[in-house]
Regions:
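Residue register of alpha-helical TPR repeats
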Residues: 13-15, 55-57
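Tetratricopeptide repeat
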Residues: 33, 39-40, 73
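Amphipathic alpha-helical segments of tetratricopeptide repeats
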Residues: 38-49
Length: 73
C-alpha cells in the first residue's frame, strides 16, 4: 500500500466501491453492478495503483461475461 495518505484514501474508496459492486452482483442486479464496476475502473485508473486497477478490471470483466458481453470482457 502506498505511503501517500491521499493515494491511500483513493485506493480505499475504490476498494469500498468494488465491495458494493460485489454486493449488487450477489443480489442479481448485474447491469447495475456493471455500471458501478465501470466507474470503479475509472477511479482505479486515476490512482495509478496497478493492483487496484487489476482488481477493478477483473470485477468488470466478470460482470461482462455474466451479461454475455463477450467482446467487452
Amino acid at each position: 500500500m502506498p505511503v501517500d495518505p491521499i493515494l491511500r484514501q483513493a485506493i480505499s474508496e475504490v476498494t469500498t466501491a468494488l465491495a458494493r459492486v460485489a454486493a449488487t452482483e450477489s443480489l442479481g442486479r448485474y447491469a447495475e453492478a456493471l455500471v458501478a464496476a465501470t466507474a470503479a475502473v475509472d477511479a482505479a485508473r486515476a490512482t495509478g495503483h496497478t493492483p487496484v486497477i487489476a482488481e477493478a478490471l477483473a470485477r468488470r470483466g466478470d460482470l461482462e461475461l455474466r451479461l454475455s458481453r463477450f467482446d467487452e470482457a
